[in-house]
Amino acid sequence: MQQQGSKSGSEMEVTWEDQQNINIFSRLNNRVHDLDDDIKSAKEKCENLEDAGNELILADEEMVRFQIGEVFAHVPRDDVETKIEEMKEATCKSLEKLEQEKESIVTQMAALKKVLYAKFKDSINLEED
């Protein structure tokens, strides 16, 4: 805080380090929003794969249509069940990694908030609206 005799004392000097911390916080905040979208998408995909697996159990047909790229191919039901299970496991692992990354970033953001609020007090707003 920079105080001079004729000034009110409310002026803050923003150092290069402070600006870097603010920029880092901003990037982390943007990443959290991206991760939220990715997590939501991964959860939906996991649920859809679970539903597909359940529907496949109820299917009477030995050959089912399975999407490969942009086309559907007739594939034996057992192969499709295996593939759906593999896809579900991969999606759930990906979801766990995304949630861990988000947790790590939120921890970093909390530490930066503490540092920035300690210096700037009410002069800075780092909260979501």
UniProtKB/Swiss-Prot annotation:
Binds specifically to cytosolic chaperonin (c-CPN) and transfers target proteins to it. Binds to nascent polypeptide chain and promotes folding in an environment in which there are many competing pathways for nonnative proteins. Together with other chaperonins, contribute to the regulation of gene expression by modulating the spliceosome function on pre-mRNA splicing post-transcriptionally by acting as a co-chaperone of Hsp90 to control levels of LSM8, especially in cold conditions. Required for microtubules (MTs) (MTs) organization and dynamicity. It holds the Pfam family Prefoldin_2. The keyword Nucleus applies. SUPFAM superfamilies: Prefoldin. It comes from the Eukaryota. Induction: Accumulates in response to cold. Reduced levels upon treatment with geldanamycin (GDA), a Hsp90 inhibitor. Its main location: cytoplasm. GO terms for cellular component: cytoplasm; nucleus; prefoldin complex. GO terms for molecular function: Hsp90 protein binding; unfolded protein binding. This is Prefoldin subunit 4. It is found in: Cytoplasm; Nucleus. Heterohexamer of two PFD-alpha type and four PFD-beta type subunits forming prefoldin co-chaperone complex. Interacts with ABI3 (via C-terminus). Interacts with PFD6. Binds to HY5 in the nucleus and at low temperature (e.g. at 4 degrees Celsius). Interacts with LSM8, a specific subunit of the LSM2-8 complex, which is a core component of the spliceosome. Binds to HSP90 to facilitate the formation of a larger complex made at least of HSP90, PFD4 and LSM8. Residues 25-59, 95-115 form a coiled coil. Keywords: Chaperone, Coiled coil, Cytoplasm, Nucleus. The keyword Coiled coil applies. Belongs to the prefoldin subunit beta family. Disruption phenotype: Hypersensitivity to oryzalin (a microtubule inhibitor). Increased sensitivity to high salt treatment. Smaller plants due to reduced cells size and associated with lower levels of both alpha and beta tubulin subunits, as well as highly disorganized cortical microtubules (MTs). Increased capacity to tolerate freezing temperatures upon acclimation (e.g. 7 days at 4 degrees Celsius) associated with a continuous accumulation of HY5 in cold conditions, characterized by a lower ubiquitination status. GO terms for biological process: cellular response to gibberellin stimulus; cold acclimation; cortical microtubule organization; mRNA processing; protein folding; response to cold; response to salt stress.
